[in-house]
Amino acid sequence: MTSETSETVRSYDRDAAAYVARTATVPDSVRAALERLADRLGPGARVLEIGSGGGRDALLAEQLGLAVRRTDVTPAFVALLREQGHGCDLLDPLVDDLSSPDGPYDAVWANASLLHVARDDLPTVLDRLAAVTRPGGLLCMSLKEGDGDGWSTHGTISGPRHFTYWRAPDAEAVVRAAGWGDVVVRRGLGGDGGETWLELSAVRDGVSP
């Protein structure tokens, strides 16, 4: 984990309750993405979630019939979800074991989490996610559109968070290079209308499920 990522995790750790309160409502774009995922996978499909945060997305995914393994790199989020009665693993997708004793996952869901991964580390993370996803399994992830990287001290929490920004062609290329095919990129505005998000979906090995 880079020093920037460590500082970002500390910020989330300090402001976890505030973050959960401010992000409690599922945006329409996220709901639509989860509905597409559930429709393609079918009931009971196993999903690895990277960056569960307050658990909002996982709850909706389960309502849609999916089985979700919750994970986060921030201890406060993991503790919060466990207090609510959910299983949640403290997990860094860059270095920790992502596998499951039940075999490969049917999909990976990484909403607004991999944008904190350093540019040079994202290929490794995507490789590792592909390795634990079945052939034909799905990837859904979101990044912020832009150039370079930088710190933010505004938004859902006040503490400093480090973001890596991506242009669509570069994001698509790094996803493809990690063993994912049929990449689709959708653009959408954030909740405040001031930032453009990239929603990427892809298929493991380019095989339709």
Predicted regions and their residues:
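Conserved beta-strand signature within the Rossmann-like core of class I S-adenosyl-L-methionine
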Residues: 136-143
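Class I SAM-dependent methyltransferase SAM/SAH-binding core
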Residues: 48, 54-97
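A short SAM/SAH-binding and catalytic strip from SAM-dependent methyltransferases
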Residues: 106-121
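A short acidic, Gly/Pro-enriched loop at the edge of an enzyme's catalytic core
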Residues: 96-108
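Conserved class I S-adenosyl-L-methionine
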Residues: 1-42, 147, 189
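Short, glycine-/aromatic-enriched active-site segment of Class I SAM-dependent methyltransferases
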Residues: 144-162
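A short glycine-rich, Lys/Arg-flanked "PGG" loop and its adjoining helix->strand segment in the class I
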Residues: 123-135
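Short alpha-helix
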Residues: 162-178
